[in-house]
């Protein structure tokens, strides 16, 4: 097998699914069917790659294996651009997506400088409840770029009046601005910002609302109330499939966590998730460990508010 080629093969080769397993107490029949298929195919090792929902699947399958006395080993392998898995330092996929977002934001900022009058560009970034990807927009700040003007994470309640006041304040200085918003920002009553406009809701198999439209809603509001030329940009699928921006560290660590999962399963472990443990910042180094899936499944690691500051042009994010 050509490992180097495998490392650079799009994950779409493996396929994906969005299927939520029921609780064992509510539907044993579904689990019986799954285990029958695994037994018929003589599958003894089951590796599931993904984020929170995937780890929930590993938890349920490994629990059922214990209940029924099955010797199949179930291991979770972390992979999510959301970076919201508990325990692990970070997740493979996040670094590449963050790299794409930082570079894209810098290019959008440059584009806005072409105008000699104030404009607003609102960029909507993935992140339902955790704002790690949106916070990555702060990485656009560098010696040759002042960075984005405002960043809004789902960890904080979104105040529309305060938002409009900040936009008006920046526009009064006569310059264009770029704003990064998480798709999952909510107002005080718990509604997503995109729900403030007429919207047909779509809910996936895990009960998650399809999030999109917050940037467009805010852009329309700014245009209507402040009369400023405003555009909304949804990075959408691009932030998770931009292979030209893949992080080398991501490739290495994805390979490492996969290999660690196989090794652990062969050594008899089950109901575990491989995690990355940082042992050094300079030079950067992470090692792999395994952790009980019950301490990870359905637990979201959110951005600590201590990381935030009033202005993303400061060292911290807004």
Regions found by a protein language model. Give the residues of each.
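Short, ordered loop/turn segments at secondary-structure junctions
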Residues: 18-19, 51-52, 77-83, 155-157, ...
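Short glycine/threonine-rich loop-to-helix capping motif typified by GTGT followed
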Residues: 191-195, 242-252, 282-294
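Accessory alpha-helical/coil subdomains and C-terminal extensions
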Residues: 48-50, 56-65, 91-231
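C-terminal catalytic subdomain
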Residues: 204-205, 210-217, 223-275
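Conserved small/polar residues in nucleotide/adenosyl-binding loops
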Residues: 307-314
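Glycine-rich oxoanion-binding loops at beta->alpha junctions
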Residues: 1-43, 53, 106
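A glycine-rich phosphate-binding loop feature that marks nucleotide/adenosyl-phosphate handling sites
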Residues: 122-129, 236-240, 275-285
């Amino acid at each position: 097998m050509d490992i180097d080629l495998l490392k650079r093969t799009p994950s779409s080769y493996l396929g994906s699914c969005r299927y939520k397993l029921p609780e064992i107490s509510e539907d044993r029949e579904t689990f019986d069917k799954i285990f029958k298929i695994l037994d018929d195919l003589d599958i003894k090792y089951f590796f599931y790659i993904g984020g929170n929902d995937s780890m929930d699947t590993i938890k349920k399958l490994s629990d059922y294996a214990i209940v029924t006395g099955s010797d199949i080993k179930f291991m979770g392998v972390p992979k999510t651009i959301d970076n919201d898995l508990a325990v692990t330092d970070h997740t493979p996929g996040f670094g590449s997506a963050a790299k794409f977002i930082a570079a894209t934001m810098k290019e959008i900022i440059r584009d806005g400088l072409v105008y000699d009058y104030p404009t607003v560009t609102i960029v909507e970034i993935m992140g339902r409840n955790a704002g790690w990807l949106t916070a990555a927009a702060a990485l656009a700040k560098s010696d040759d770029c002042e960075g984005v003007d405002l960043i809004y994470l789902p960890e904080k309640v979104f105040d529309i009046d305060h938002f409009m006041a900040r936009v008006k304040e920046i526009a009064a200085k006569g310059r264009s601005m770029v704003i990064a918003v998480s798709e999952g920002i909510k107002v005080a009553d718990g509604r997503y910002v995109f729900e403030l406009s007429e919207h047909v809701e779509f809910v996936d198999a895990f009960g998650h609302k399809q999030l999109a439209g917050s940037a467009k809603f805010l852009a329309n509001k700014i245009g209507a109330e402040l009369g400023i030329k405003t555009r909304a940009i949804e990075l959408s699928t691009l932030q998770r499939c931009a292979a030209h921006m893949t992080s080398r560290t991501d490739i290495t660590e994805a390979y490492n966590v996969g290999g660690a999962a196989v090794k652990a399963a062969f050594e008899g472990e089950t109901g575990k998730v491989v995690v990355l443990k940082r042992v050094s910042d300079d030079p950067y180094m992470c090692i792999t460990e395994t952790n009980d899936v019950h301490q990870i499944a359905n637990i979201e690691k959110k951005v600590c508010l201590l990381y935030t500051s009033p202005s993303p042009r400061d060292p911290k994010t807004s």
